Amino acid sequence: MLDGGMVFTREEGWKEMKLGRVFKGADIITVNKNRHEITNSQYVAHLGSHHLFLEKLEHELLPITNKTIIADGATWIWNWANASYPEATQILDFYHAKEHLCDYAQVQFKEQAEKHKWIDEQCLLLLNDKVSDVIQNIKEQKTITKTKQQKQSLLTYYTNNSKRMKYKTYRDEGLLIGSGPIESAHRNVIQKRMKLSGQRWTIEGAQQLANLRVLNKSNQWGSLEKLIKMAA
């Protein structure tokens, strides 16, 4: 899983800290039908270029077979996945897909009841591998001036990602369909320590602290302690 969040730097203002979370299917515990817990994860973080971030991430992916990549639809992520892991299962985060749908419906429908009913119907179709039906239903909505651009944007987003939106199939295979674990990881690994009130980081300092946070949350703190003892 991959995601980005902003930290405030002295040199460049707000700058994206990219975070990757790698875990095995065996580390996912089902608490109930709507909740899962991940017992062990490896993290990587990088402030800046996605090329350097991906180099770090690929190191953690090496031992993983039958890879699954869940992301929000950023083009650079899918380009990387297609080039580096063409055999991997790619999944568009369901909740981002729903968010785009809701944003469109918010301006398309005047009546709240009608809006919610339409959204629920489309989400049910998505969860049953019927993204093509949803695309057709969006096309059939009357185009009004204020939604023309948003409608086309939604259609493009769904069409470009349709092969990554087989949510029933993924669930039947025991796969996650949401990027909640990486979003919560960003809060826990990065933001909880690096977005406190008044904080401004040098780029170098932010990266160094992120490296320490990643080691800690990946249960690799012991390796750092060994290096310190060896250097003492």
PLM-predicted stretches and their roles:
Residues M1-A232:
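Catalytic center-proximal scaffold of phosphoryl-transfer enzymes
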